């Protein structure tokens, strides 16, 4: 059985060994847990964002960063590229931000390998038939605050490991690492929608790849939450190899997956969020999806694609001006 925690540990150790190069800070808490500050009190870096994203994906994906000129010849943004041969485990079993970590006054959205020990949420792991077994727990936190010993103790208890074997990586939304890792969810947005909104068995997805632009750091966490989500919703492109069964309507799946199928399509995410009174649960689940979806049905040999990138919404989201 693949272990997302054990597969991610060498990446964590690499980040610790290269902390100065990556502009990170490593903190050992009094209870022995290790905290990696990837953007709260430090600058972080794109390379750190790449490694942070690989850890979010449980060490089961290749992550790269490049400049893509295919969106618009005037709007040039770096892009994060993802590919994985274990889509269900890497994206839903690890990367999905499925753990709301709330301890005292501390709150963060948790993603990454430790979720597969704590089974957060349990229903997801039942759907993909996966659970990790490891004596270490690695959790990625999206927060503008660093966790303390109480948070580490909470994670250790939920994961069933000694607190000295807990690694907590922290990056605010409004940071380079935060921007990279959110765009790095481009494949996961598709598998999440397959499972949660379309009730498709994601274990049939045998390989997945995706690319999405990375948002510039343009303001506080709220503004960045809007911009980072828009990168995937209006700029993300994904490719899925699906081994269908008789009776699976893969063409319908492909048409239903992209963000353009949502009623709120065409508006920057922050605008939609405001209209929902800043309540994620009031937002159409269909909006959390890549802009373009291509599916290769391995059973039938058919190749199909639906959706399109929307550069105008990206420019509006970023308040981009061509000088």
UniProtKB/Swiss-Prot annotation:
SUPFAM superfamilies per the UniProt record, alphabetical: Methenyltetrahydromethanopterin cyclohydrolase
InterPro entries attached to this UniProt entry: METHMP_CycHdrlase
Lineage summary: Archaea, Methanobacteriati, Methanobacteriota, Methanomada group, Methanococci
Protein name: Methenyltetrahydromethanopterin cyclohydrolase
Keywords per UniProt: Cytoplasm, Hydrolase, Methanogenesis, One-carbon metabolism
Family: Belongs to the MCH family.
Pathway: One-carbon metabolism; methanogenesis from CO(2); 5,10-methenyl-5,6,7,8-tetrahydromethanopterin from CO(2): step 3/3
Catalytic activity: 5,10-methenyl-5,6,7,8-tetrahydromethanopterin + H2O = N(5)-formyl-5,6,7,8-tetrahydromethanopterin + H(+)
Signal peptide coordinates: none
GO biological process terms held by the UniProt record: methanogenesis, from carbon dioxide; one-carbon metabolic process
Role noted for this protein: Catalyzes the reversible interconversion of 5-formyl-H(4)MPT to methenyl-H(4)MPT(+).
GO molecular function: methenyltetrahydromethanopterin cyclohydrolase activity
Superkingdom of the organism of origin: Archaea
GO cellular-component term (any): cytoplasm
Subcellular location: Cytoplasm
Keyword Cell inner membrane: no
Tagged with keyword Hydrolase: yes
Enzyme Commission number, as recorded: 3.5.4.27
